[in-house]
């Protein structure tokens, strides 16, 4: 089976989910699946975990999308940059025609879920690890009455309801999604 794995980060850097993504990809490869990893590229020369070496150019194809990090305080620029990245990822998946898609947690998931469902007509597993905008609400950055919160909440709800499957990293996160988004 051909599985597209769309990462929020890059193996160029040790981001917070590095080990989880590495292990998911290795698990798929060890079970005989072909994996097309789509990831951001921050450095001039892409880097990968050593465990990937025996699979590169065989079962594992990697497509790097150049990405420039935006200032952490510039939420709008970061959101638009991520949306551009996922648009490019969807274009790559349209060419590759995966059998299934694994989408890592991100703030613009609605776009990739919509594209997978309606354009590619491909099953998509959305792996939620950081519930946006709930994380901003719980941190006191956004209020539930703000337009930004309402729009972001509606877009994430679309992603949750329309993904073929949804996975979370903890039971309390699952409970939050079920409760705050009315997802069965």
Where are the regions a protein language model picked out?
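N-terminal subdomain of nucleotide-sugar transferases
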Residues: 1-50, 54
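Acceptor-binding helix/loop patch of EC 2.4 sugar-transfer enzymes
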Residues: 8, 12, 67-76, 96, ...
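Helix C-cap/helix->beta junction micro-motif
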Residues: 31, 96, 119-122, 162
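A conserved catalytic-core segment of Leloir-type glycosyltransferases
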Residues: 37-96
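An aromatic- and histidine-rich active-site surface loop
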Residues: 45, 78-88, 98-134
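Membrane-proximal helix-turn-helix segments that form the acceptor-binding/catalytic region
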Residues: 90, 110-119, 132, 146-166
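Helix-loop-beta element that forms the nucleotide-linked donor phosphate-binding surface
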Residues: 162, 167-168, 174-184
